[in-house]
Amino acid sequence: MIELKNVHHHYPDGTRALKDINLNIPKGEFLLICGPNGSGKTTLIRLISGLLKPTAGSVHVNGLDPIHDSKEVRHLVGMVFQDPDSQIVGETVKEDVAFGPENLGLPLTEITERVDWALHVMGLKDLSEKACYLLSGGEKRRLSIAGVLAMRPQVILFDEPFSFLDYPGIQEVLRHMVHLHREGHTILVTTHDVEKVIAQVDRIAIIHGGELKLAGPPKELMMKLPQFGIRPPCYALLGKEKVSWLE
């Protein structure tokens, strides 16, 4: 479904962010993209979403180029940013979730249906008229996900989704991510803190210094994480079976 071939990316000041990335992500996969801060994780998913253009190489989603076929790819791919405040644009919860569908030019009846559905899925129905600035950190995170869901994407990109959240908030967001995966969505999540999500994912891709170092099942790569500045989950260090944060 997603193909990155010989992808390089340099920022305008000449800083190299990614070097020769080759990665195929099948439909329905739950992929963890991990690496230390500044490794290129966010740049990678921004290329997939079409927010950035590769300096060299190609990115395709269902055979479409996120830059040249931006309108079609916006229907396929949704991104949840690290800072939910940067993604919230409406005055109320309902208005914010409606923003995306409205900009697609959808009929009012379909906008209403999508908004109601997204609010229900994310447990925000009772907060639909609440001002966004009054929401807690966890509620803002759920709102940013609801706004993406209202666009009905097949692929959802989560950039450091557990930042700024307490333990109950992390569990809540993780529970929704797992549910979306079970519903058939392709899920990509970036983080330097693998402990919270590694028990749920199908595969890990390790990014270090802008390069894709390894990709494979969590069980195979778990104890190789420290080589790339990533702390393995506690259960792996203790020699135990995987433990989910949802248990």
Place the predicted regions along the sequence by residue.
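Conserved ABC ATPase "signature" region
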Residues: T109-L127
